[in-house]
Amino acid sequence: MSEPEKTDSVETVKNTIKSTQLTTEHAKKLTQVVNSIPTILSKLDNSEYDEIFGHRINVDSKKFVDVAVRNEILLKFLAADEYDVELATKRLIDTLNWRNKFHPLSAAFDENFNKALNDLGAITNFVGLKSDNLNVVTWNFYGATTPKKLFEEYGDNAGTTTNQRPGSQFLRWRIGLMEKSLQLVDFTDPKNNKIAQVHDYNNVSMFKVDKGMRAATKEIIKIFGDNYPELLSTKFFINVPSLMSWVFTFFKTIGVISEATLKKFQVLNSGNLTEWFGKSNLPPTYGGDSKSSMKELNVASIKLSPYGEYILEELGKKEIEDVIDEVE
């Protein structure tokens, strides 16, 4: 009979957190979540799936568990629900179940997507910026293709991968972009434990947005809101027509967008981002003087965490076994 896993003290848990100064009350709440990990895992659809953002969410003694990183990730879930342990626990269970079903690491590191999709985005990793949590950025170039054509080919579950992963190719590509970017953050570093997003609407009509694009955007917003808490530092909306800029303020007035969320938004009529990222980091398209294009600035090779690699290896083995079972 195995011995019960020892519980962590409030002081021990508090000392692992480097991203912020935890109050004693918040540290107590986080300790509750940490010590309830076995219970959380027991309530999952698959109790063996314990990965979030490529890191193992399990008890201290398990292989691959980085206690400090694990606790920082758990803290994000807790903070997103205003330190309500019950709500945070439910969010964790839902996220682990979603990851077990969706396999976002596969979308990021195993699956191949059409060039039309890959041209829609990029990931940059700048250094030496004056503001925190702007180092890692995901870029979305909505004008890179025709939305109608894009969603006819890659939306609404069209052209899903051969092993029938959940979601459309567009959704899996976009989630994969997010997952890749998270491998570049340091969850223990208050200056680099979040990412920024740039949404470039150059050449996109804000009045004739394709219905497929609207539906996909709505789905992605929900998935990110549910499963990627406290990971966004700033969201830039650039090349937005002047006539549309008032919409964000209007949403705030009627309560659709909260004050906290609105503070993360930067809505620009132009594409000049030098105030935040500096001229030397950006190509002329975004106000800079770098001779590198966005394609060249894109971080093409991103290494997955050791536990993430292990998860993908196990997933591959399971799929091979499933194929063998079908043949037999």
Swiss-Prot record:
GO terms for biological process: Golgi to plasma membrane protein transport; phosphatidylinositol metabolic process; regulation of establishment of cell polarity; regulation of exocytosis. Keywords: Cytoplasm, Endoplasmic reticulum, Heme, Iron, Lipid transport, Membrane, Metal-binding, Microsome, Transport. SMART domains: SEC14. Heme binds at Y142, R174, H199, Y201, K235. Its main location: cytoplasm. It catalyses: a 1,2-diacyl-sn-glycero-3-phospho-(1D-myo-inositol)(in) = a 1,2-diacyl-sn-glycero-3-phospho-(1D-myo-inositol)(out). The keyword DNA repair does not apply. PANTHER family: PHOSPHATIDYLINOSITOL TRANSFER PROTEIN SFH5 (PTHR47669:SF1). Belongs to the SFH5 family. This is Phosphatidylinositol transfer protein SFH5. It comes from Scheffersomyces stipitis (strain ATCC 58785 / CBS 6054 / NBRC 10063 / NRRL Y-11545) (Yeast).
